[in-house]
Amino acid sequence: VCQEAEKNGYELDQDSQDQIDSITSNLSLYASVYGYSKPVDYLKAMYGKGATLEGYQNYLRANLTASGYQDSYKDSLTFSADEVSAKDREDSKVYNSYSYNQYYLSSSRYLDDEATNEEKAAAAEADAKTITGTDIQSVADFDAAIAKLEVNADSSAASTALTDNRYTSVSSIIADWISDSSRKEGDKTYIASTSTSTDEDGNEVTTISGYYAVYYTGSTDNQFPLVNVRHILAGFEGGTTDDSGNTTYSDEEKAAAKQTAEDLLNEWKQGEATEDSFAALATEKTTDTGSKDNGGLYENVYPGQMVSAFNNWCFDSSRKPGDTGIVETNYGYHVMYFVGQSEETYREYLIKTDLETDAYNTWYNTLVESVDMTVGDTSHIRTDLVLSANS
C-alpha cells in the first residue's frame, strides 16, 4: 500500500509528520526508563540488532503513509443510487433491525446425571412449550412464565430484550424465523440449538443442547434519516481513578460541570443564538477535541453511534432544527444544538458501508497480489538457534 501511495504522489499530512517527530523525540525518554543509554540501544532491544534510528523512522513513515492512503481511498469512494438499490436487492433483510425477547433453556440444567441427553432435551423442550404457549400474550407474560419454571426455582430469571438488533447480529439459530416477512408482534416460538458429531461407527449424530424461546415485538427497515448535531462538552474535571483505571466523579465535580454547561447555554441564548454562534462557542469552549475544530459538529449520526443519553436526545421524534438542551453522559454535560436531519437514511448508510467494505477489500487484495516478494537484509537474523519445549 505504501508503494502504491508513493507511486500516486500521496504525501503525509502535517499531523502525521508531527506524530513521527513526537514518537522519535520520545525515544530518549523510553530508553532512559528501560535502562538504555541511547535511543538506538532501546530500538535494538525492542526490534533486533539490525534496528537503527533511520530504519525506525522509515518504518513509522511507511506505516502512516499506508494508513493515510487507505483512508484517502475509502474517502474517495462514492456509490450511485442504482448501486445502492442493487446491493439492497441482494438480500434486503440484511439491512433490517429486529426487536424481540429471547430465553435459552439449556438441556444440561434438566434432570440428573443419570438422564440421557435425549431425556434432558425433552425436559427442556417441555418448558420451552410452556413459556411460548397460547396463554403468553405479552413480554410480561413471557417473563412471568420463565420465572415460574421449576428449573428456575432457586434463582431469578427473565428473558433478554434485544431492541432494534441488526439482522447480522441475530443468532443464526433464530434468524430465519425472526426475519420471516409474515412475522408480527406477539409471535412466539422455540427453536432447538443443535450440534453435529460422528460416532465411533462413522454415523452422523445430532445432539440438542437446548432451546431458544423467542417472543417477537417488532422490526424496522431503517428507512429513517440520519441526523446532524452540534454540541459543547463541559467535561468532568478531577475525579478519582481506581487500580483498574476507572474514574469516578463526586457530586460536587458533576455539579460544577453541569453549571458550566448551563452557563454556556445561557451565554449562547444571550448572544445571536444562531447555529453559527453556537459553532463559534463550541470551538472556543468545548472540551471534546474530536469536534472542537469544526464547531462541535457531528454529521450523519446513526442510532447507537453515540452514548445512550446523547443518542436519545438526537433521535427524539419531537426533535426539530434549532432545538437546544443539556444531557449528561459519562464524559460530562453536553450542550446540544440540533442542526437537522440528513439527506441520507440509516438504511442507505448501512448499504454504503457494505459497498465500501467490498470495494476496499477488492482494491487491497488486488494490490497485495500484485506485489513481488523480495527478500531483504537477513544478515542480523540468527539462524543457529534451536527452540525446544520441555516435556
Q: Can you say where each PLM-predicted feature lies in the sequence?
A:
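Sec/Tat-exported extracytoplasmic proteins
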Residues: 3-9, 24-31, 60, 64, ...
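PPIase-associated folding chaperone regions across multiple families
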Residues: 45-122, 167-259, 283, 303-391
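Short, charged helix-to-loop "capping" segments that act as catalytic/coupling loops
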Residues: 13-17, 271-277, 317-319
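Intrinsically disordered, low-complexity coil/linker segments enriched for acidic/polar
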Residues: 38, 116, 138-141
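Peptidyl-prolyl cis-trans isomerase
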Residues: 126-177, 263-308, 339-345
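A generic structural-conservation signal
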Residues: 14-16, 155, 187, 291, ...
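Short amphipathic alpha-helical segments that mediate assembly, nucleic-acid/protein binding
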Residues: 16, 20, 39-40, 121-124, ...
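N-terminal targeting/tethering segments
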Residues: 1-58, 63
